[in-house]
Amino acid sequence: RSIVTAFGVAVAAFCILTGFIMKDSLDTLMHGGLTSSIKYEYLYRLNALEEGTPEQGEALFQNYYEVEGKTVQLLAQGISKDSKYFPDKTDGGDALDLDKYYLTSAAAQTYGIKTGDTLTFSNIADLKEHKVTISGIVTDNTHCYLYTGRENATALAGVDSDAYNCIISKDALSLDKDRVA
């Protein structure tokens, strides 16, 4: 009986300790990992492409791409000039130049790409192949993003250079419900 009780107490203690360890790890991931490269709280995906500058928030162009042989899609983020919602430096401390292309650390690891390598990917809408040279890596261990300027991202997608399909903001916006997907 004593052995069974001692074994039960040991198993219970192990379960409790495992729970504390997992909680700490998940707290670190949720508070540090998911927000490591983005600084906005709200992303509104629009039903249709719009052009220019939105009245509220900041314009963003997003488009999904496939990398051959990989199951994880690449999301290109077309960032507006002087954006306050995206990183401004690479892991190496270099300033981001929105005329170039940068990968998040998760994307770099997933696709096996380093700074200076060429990344080949295809637009999932028209299967057109694109090749870009990666100028740096941005720390973000949860998102497979390709960061570039809005003009570059729209050119990859074959739409007008002033187009956007998302609005991002730190605060909730009052947008027309018919505009938002």
Residue ranges and their predicted role:
Residues D24, T28-A181:
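Basic-flanked hydrophobic alpha-helices used for secretion and membrane insertion
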Residues S2-S25:
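Short, strongly hydrophobic transmembrane alpha-helices
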